[in-house]
Every structure is written in structure tokens, then in C-alpha cells.
Amino acid sequence: MAPKADPARRVVADNRKARFHYEITDTVEAGIALTGTEVKSLRGGKATIGEAYAGPSGDEFFLFNAYIPEYLEANRFNHETKRPRRLLLHRRQINKFLGATQREGYTVIPLKIYFNERGRAKVELGLGRGKKLHDKRETAKERDWQRDKARLMRDKG
């Protein structure tokens, strides 16, 4: 059975391929600076972060290429769907990400967008390095073996 979901943490968008394409070494929770129509649209649950990434712009970090659809009930005051969104991080976290991305070849990838128990929109960021093709094959083999092992244990037991 799947583990029970945390009722206080409602996931809006999930980047499921990130863990396949990247070796995630560290995760951090960050806030997102959003407009009112973006929050209302996120509550509808139609956001996409499959092609999104986080990067520096000046001395701040932004979430680029994240798609939040327009809010249908809004009129001319709607938001731009793929605009850069400022991430709310501590200075120490920003410096850590800057060092890792500039020197060590890491990438900052959004893993999830969710609402916390206080109703604030948060993004879970992962610091990761891209996997090579043979690493992806090993990951797929390991996943298949775990599935087969569980199936054998279930059928024998």
C-alpha cells in the first residue's frame, strides 16, 4: 500500500522525472513570490514544473520556466504563465546554491510545489547533478529488481 499523504501538505505539482534524470544530493524548502491570480490558479492544481529550473539572477534565485496557467475568472489583471518567480531563500542557502552551480556543475531543480499547513505556496528544491545514460539504466534495473523481489515475496508468502 502507498503511504498516507500528509493532509497539511497538499501537493499541486510534482516533478517525477527529476529523480530519474538527476542525482539529487540535497533538498531545501523555499517560498515563492506569487501574484494573487497565480495563487488562485495553483489552488486549481494545473501547474507544470517538468521543464522548470531555478537559477540566480543578480543576488537572488528565481524559478524559471514553471508553467502556472492563467486564472480563468480573472480579467485583464491576469498573470504571465511562464514568468520568472522569485524564490524566498535565506542568504546562506543562496550562497550554497551559487557555489554548487558555479563551481561543481550542479543544477537546482524544483521537485514539488505544494501548500503548507498555513496555506502558503512552497517549492521543494533539489540540488542535483545530471545522470549519464548508464546511470539511468542502472536506476531502471534496480527499480525492476525491487519490483520483482516484492512480487516473489508476495507470491511465496
UniProtKB/Swiss-Prot annotation:
**Sorted UniProt keywords:** Cytoplasm, RNA-binding
One GO term (biological process): trans-translation
Principal subcellular localization: cytoplasm
Q: Where in the cell is it found?
A: Cytoplasm
The record ties this protein, via SUPFAM superfamilies, to: Small protein B (SmpB) (SSF74982)
Which residues lie in Basic and acidic residues bias regions?
A: 135-157
Q: Which GO terms describe its molecular function?
A: RNA binding
- Asked if the record carries the keyword Ligase, the reply is no
Region span, Disordered:
133-157
Alphabetical list of InterPro entries matching this protein: SmpB (IPR023620), SsrA-bd_prot (IPR000037), SsrA-bd_prot_CS (IPR020081)
Q: What PROSITE patterns does this protein map onto?
A: SSRP (PS01317)
- Pfam family, any one: SmpB
State a GO cellular component annotated for this protein: cytosol
- Briefly state the protein's biological role: Required for rescue of stalled ribosomes mediated by trans-translation. Binds to transfer-messenger RNA (tmRNA), required for stable association of tmRNA with ribosomes. tmRNA and SmpB together mimic tRNA shape, replacing the anticodon stem-loop with SmpB. tmRNA is encoded by the ssrA gene; the 2 termini fold to resemble tRNA(Ala) and it encodes a 'tag peptide', a short internal open reading frame. During trans-translation Ala-aminoacylated tmRNA acts like a tRNA, entering the A-site of stalled ribosomes, displacing the stalled mRNA.
Q: Which family does it belong to?
A: Belongs to the SmpB family.
What is the protein named? SsrA-binding protein
